[in-house]
Each structure stands twice: as structure tokens, then as C-alpha cells.
Amino acid sequence: TAAEVTTEAASESAAETSAAAGDEMTVTYPVTITDHLGREVTIEKQPESFVSGYYISTSLMIALGLDDQLVGVEAKADKRNIYKLSAPELTELPSVGTAKEFDLEGCAALKPDLVIVPTKLKDSIPAMEELGLTVIAVNPEDQTKLFETIDMISTAADVVEKGQELEYWISDALESLKKSLDGVETPSVYLAGNSALLQTAGPEMYQSTLIENAGGVNAASDITDTYWADTSYEQILSWNPDYIVLAADADYDVDSVLNDSALADCTTVKEGHIAQIPSDIEALDSPVPASFLGSYYVASILHPDVVTEDDFKTTEKNFYETFYGIKK
């Protein structure tokens, strides 16, 4: 169907644009990159080794073909299905901790040419620089910032062409989805958080964009929190969403929501309009390159007559095969 994105169509579009860009694809060092903290970071020569202190950037580096240059990654890498399926060697690499507890000395001991961290680690960056590390901070919290992150890393590593191919693939997929959903009614969606049903994503979060791209409206669009916001049963009943969608890594399930007596009067529950975003390869509601697939999945729930489950599965299969070498 129209919403389905084939590997051939996306690759042709990427190839045409790459050809038009010509010589701009090769990076000349030193190169200066402005990161998401507004820091101007000069990279003197092409990096040969990287540390990624953030799952989002690690997944992106696999998609850019840079996983074999990683010498250290974030904690709990062995729990990530995406790594096991696409780059199992990453599960054996030294851990540099988390955004809450980053291992500065451990990172420095790996002597990476470039370190990529989330902007949450901004207070640790001066100490990293004192240890002689070159650091860029990223915060891909929406589609624009995701593409900026792809640009930063692909420029730093001199894989601009691969970065552009990835961006064109994602853009084509979202454009195809948008055309398919043109003119549909937009039901309201309550997106429930990972750690609790009574947490939701406000309009500043990537998950809100995911809902809009899927042809829905965020039921919590009037809240001002920039992270997961606490809410209440009364608030959910007041919003009376058409659908409740659970975050991919929620530690509760669809049945527990359907059987929650506090929501017995909610139309959504009565009609069984509850779903959970898939996480069999990786969480499709986190701002990884594949996050556009989260919109495809939610669209298949909200508008199954326009975007089918097969559209989602075919597009998912083609994307992961093209950029991660995963055959489903």
C-alpha cells in the first residue's frame, strides 16, 4: 500500500540526492561541529575510536556503520536486543556508566578519539576535557534534533553520505505516512510512561511528535512538563482519550490497564482501545533512527484501514535490514 516503504524506493531517493551533493560528501579536517549545548568542538583528525555514553547515539552509530570503531559504550549494553541482533560485539565492550553515573576515568582510560554523550552530562564535560577528551553532546529529542545528531556524528566520522542516506530514508518514510493519513480524523491518544500508567509525555517530548506523525493528537498537549509528567486517574477520565498507548518499555501491560477498576468508566477501556508500542528489536518510542517506525505502528492502531499492520512490518523489515543488517 501507499504507506509501505520499500528498500528500493528509499535507496533510489538517497542515491539521487547523494549524487547531486557530489564532493561535499568528504570531510576535510580539522572540522568544527556545534553540538546541542551550543559548544563549538574542533575535531583535528578523523577519529578512529569512539566512546558512546548513550544508547541513542550507540544505535545511531550502528546505522552509520561505525560500530566496529566503538571502544566503550553505555551501561547495560548486554540487555539491548538491537545490539545482540546487529552488533553483538558491543555487548562485550567496557561500560562507561550512565548519564547519572558516568565513569570519567574509565572513559579516559579507553583513549577514544571522540566521546559522544547526552546533554544531561553537560556538567561532566569540563572534567572530560581536562582529561584530554574531545566530546560532543547530543539531545535528539525531536525529528530536527535527531537529524542534527546524525549530521554531527556523520560529519565527525567522515561518513556524511551514509548519514544523508539514513536521513532520506526516514524522511521518505514519514512523507509517505503523511500522504496516506492526509484528511483522516485525528483521535486523541494518551501515551502512558515506562514506569507508571499515571505518567505521560507532554508536547515537548519526542513521543508527542510520534503521536502527531501517526495521525493522532496528544491528549496531554496542554501540560508544560518537559519530561514525563505525573498525572491522575481523574485527569485521564477528564481527557477521555480515544486510545491509550503504553510506552515500549512499560513495566505493566495492556491487560493490567484493561482490568484497572479506576478506569472502568473510560470509553477507551470499554472499547478495548489499548495498545503497546513494540520493543522486540528496540523501543520504537525512543529517539533512535528507527523511531519513525513507532509512528507507523501507532498509525496502524489508530487508522488500520489506511495503514495496515503489514505496512508497519514491511517498513520495519526493510529499514532494519538496510541499516542494521537484521533480517526479520
Residue ranges and their predicted role:
Residues 52-110, 114-116, 120, 219:
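A short, structured surface patch at a secondary-structure boundary
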Residues 51-53, 69-74, 114-118, 135-138, ...:
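Structural recognition of the beta-strand scaffold that forms the well-ordered cores
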Residues 1-46:
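Short, low-complexity disordered leader/linker segments with a strong preference
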Residues 66, 89-91, 131-132, 214-215, ...:
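Short, structured coil segments at secondary-structure junctions
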Residues 33, 40, 123-199, 220-222, ...:
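Extracytoplasmic substrate-binding proteins
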Residues 121-130, 246-260:
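A ligand-binding cleft/hinge motif common to bilobed small-molecule-binding domains
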Residues 200-228:
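Alpha-helical, coiled-coil/dimerization segments enriched in small aliphatic residues
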Residues 96-99, 103-117, 133, 232-249:
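Proline-aspartate-enriched helix->loop->beta-strand connector
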